[in-house]
Amino acid sequence: MFERNQKTIFVLDHTRYFSIASEEYISMDFLKGKPSGDGGATGAAGNATGSGGSQFSKSLWTCACESSIEYCRVVWDLFPGKKHVRFIVSDTAAHIVNTWSPSTQNMSHVMNAMVMVGVPSRNVPTSSDYSVIHGLRAAIEALAEPTDEQLAAMADLGTDELPRIPNKGRVICITSARDNTSMKSLEDIFNTVLVQQNTLAAPPAKKGLVIDHCHLVILNIVPLGVESLVTNRSLLKISPLLDVEIHTVSAPDISYKLTHLILNHYDLASTTVTNIPMKEEQNANSSANYDVEILHSRRAHSITCGPDFSLPTSIKQGATYETVTLKWCTPRGCGSAHLQPCLGQFLVTPVDVTSRPSSCLINFLLNGRSVLLEMPRKTGSKATSHMLSARGGEIFVHSLCITRSCMDEAPSITDGPGGRVSDYRTAELGQLIKMSRMVPLKVKDPSAPPLTRRLPRYFPLTTSSSILFHLQRHISWLPHFLHLLVKEDMDKQDEVRCQQHIHELYKSASRGDVLPFTHTNGARLKLSKAKDQYRLLYRELEQLIQLNATTMHHKNLLESLQSLRAAYGDAPLKSEPGASLLRSFTESPLSPERLEPISSVGASGSSNSNSLLKASKRRMSSCGQRSLLDIISSAERSQSNKRLDFSGRLCTPLGQVAKLYPEFGTKDKDAVTTGASITPNVKEESVRS
């Protein structure tokens, strides 16, 4: 509730230095049309044309007052009655401009007090009594004073044993220092006074609230074009009670700096409404497009954007922060069915409240009109993401839902990413969930099967992905047959029934009966296609039995089915049982056919000339075929058999390690030995000579 931005205190340096000009000259020659140059001309330009008295420059004090008052205006517009801002002017002493009382937390009171303070006099002699330290001491004392909300919370607590009220705050000091040493001295004095104030607030004195934490922001301002010896510094933790950051900025840019800081201080975002059609002031028959920058809560963008949208951001000239660019959307009539739901509404305030585009937009909204704003999608199209409207004299930005909202109907399960799917086995899935319901037991049963045995091992999600479960709607005995296959306690009688059904399938295949598929539209299939369907049916049936083969009766059924497949000419390849079981678990029944070994293809080619055609038609992988690793391994072995093996491996006895380069080093030894035998002869010949 009591956050760090609950209390903000501005300490304004009112010493003699702040009476000098900011060196940003503003033209006053309005009778000759628009000024030819930018209003923020340099000092040299001002001196060149300033002899006619058509330009003037604000003082450092005026720049500091205007920017700080704009800061508190934004705070009070967006957080009326919730966030508090105080002002303290420091020269020979600390002058309190306003208090935490709601009666002084308004623009009129602050501006009237600033008028009474006035610009610092240049005729005041330089003295050590003029210092900003007086204002910093008063700011710490002001942080210890409770606000009305804190007083109400203290009254609700009642006793001292309850947790004390959190008390955090921020002090923004606008001053001008000579160098980093002066800044370091200012930090040390502030930290010392902060510790002393907490000592006074602790029992038994209890003079005010204990300050839990303080954030000190020092703005060192200088005239335009003057270099400062004070370096910028990001947020630094001085002590457990104090964090300090330092910014050096020219006087004309202090408003941009405070706007940048307020975004982080109050979690705000900047939005620029572009392409606002507006009548020209001098020519009512023509119109031009203007831009207006507004501030609001950052959540206005975060709750709207989805993965398909990206915020278009830009940096305003002279500023250092990013602003989101949204385009003015021409209102178009639409019924209530086309209105987008609102995710949230947030107060809005313009950055430059005195500009003509801002005032026109504010009056347009206060007259009861609404403005729709567009943001681009990643695909290139646009979507209406926000709406500006006014109620009760306050302007709000509404975040519209541009993605699927919770009020929309749930997406249909038939709208899959691969197209429209309409044959999900929804009813069977519900039955499976009921059968798989688990309940906790007070005493563990040692004879109970493990949990992995109770989990479903094979369940096609769609009817079109399974031949076996597709036919159960058209063959009367097939549902009961499938129920018997997955029984954990299959007995001999169930095995006999299943054997009879398997033999019926074999007889139907022998007679050439066509399986009753709905997609055949009653047309009789070719014999080769009917055989392929029976082969697919046998393979899926074998996969289902193998996954549920937990009893001896299941294993007998599996052997019987494999023998029938062999008699039908579709015998499975011999492979390792572990690999086949793994493939049964991990593969879909309609996955593509694997490549078969060259030897098996050659053997089957003599018996069936259409084996390649049938293999291309097969859409199911059986448990006895090879994996990708087997295919790659066999290909590597076939290539290695064509090359002669390493001679060292061939000559080395089994169990020993082959020596690489066995003659390596032998020639060098022979050369050394030969050289040693030749050297004495050479010496003898030289002695003789």
Swiss-Prot record:
Taxonomy, superkingdom: Eukaryota
Q: Which GO terms describe its cellular component?
A: cytoplasm; INTAC complex; integrator complex; nucleus; perinuclear region of cytoplasm
Q: What the entry says about post-translational processing?
A: Phosphorylated.
Q: Which intervals of the chain are annotated as region Disordered? A: 591-619, 669-689
Q: Which residues form a coiled coil?
A: 521-550
Q: Name one Pfam family in it.
A: Mat89Bb
**Gene Ontology annotations of biological process type:** cell division; centrosome localization; dorsal appendage formation; flagellated sperm motility; meiotic cell cycle; oocyte nucleus localization involved in oocyte dorsal/ventral axis specification; posterior mRNA localization involved in anterior/posterior axis specification; regulation of fertilization
**UniProtKB keywords:** Cell cycle, Cell division, Coiled coil, Cytoplasm, Developmental protein, Differentiation, Meiosis, Mitosis, Nucleus, Phosphoprotein, Spermatogenesis
- Family the UniProt entry places it in: Belongs to the Integrator subunit 13 family.
How would you summarize the oligomeric state and partners of this protein? Belongs to the multiprotein complex Integrator, at least composed of IntS1, IntS2, IntS3, IntS4, omd/IntS5, IntS6, defl/IntS7, IntS8, IntS9, IntS10, IntS11, IntS12, asun/IntS13, IntS14 and IntS15. The core complex associates with protein phosphatase 2A subunits mts/PP2A and Pp2A-29B, to form the Integrator-PP2A (INTAC) complex.
The record's PANTHER family line, in alphabetical order, gives: INTEGRATOR COMPLEX SUBUNIT 13, SARCOMA ANTIGEN NY-SAR-95-RELATED
Q: What is this protein for, i.e. what is its function?
A: Component of the integrator complex, a multiprotein complex that terminates RNA polymerase II (Pol II) transcription in the promoter-proximal region of genes. The integrator complex provides a quality checkpoint during transcription elongation by driving premature transcription termination of transcripts that are unfavorably configured for transcriptional elongation: the complex terminates transcription by (1) catalyzing dephosphorylation of the C-terminal domain (CTD) of Pol II subunit Polr2A/Rbp1 and Spt5, and (2) degrading the exiting nascent RNA transcript via endonuclease activity.
What is the protein name stated in its UniProt record? Protein asunder
Organism field:
Drosophila simulans
The record's gene field reads asun
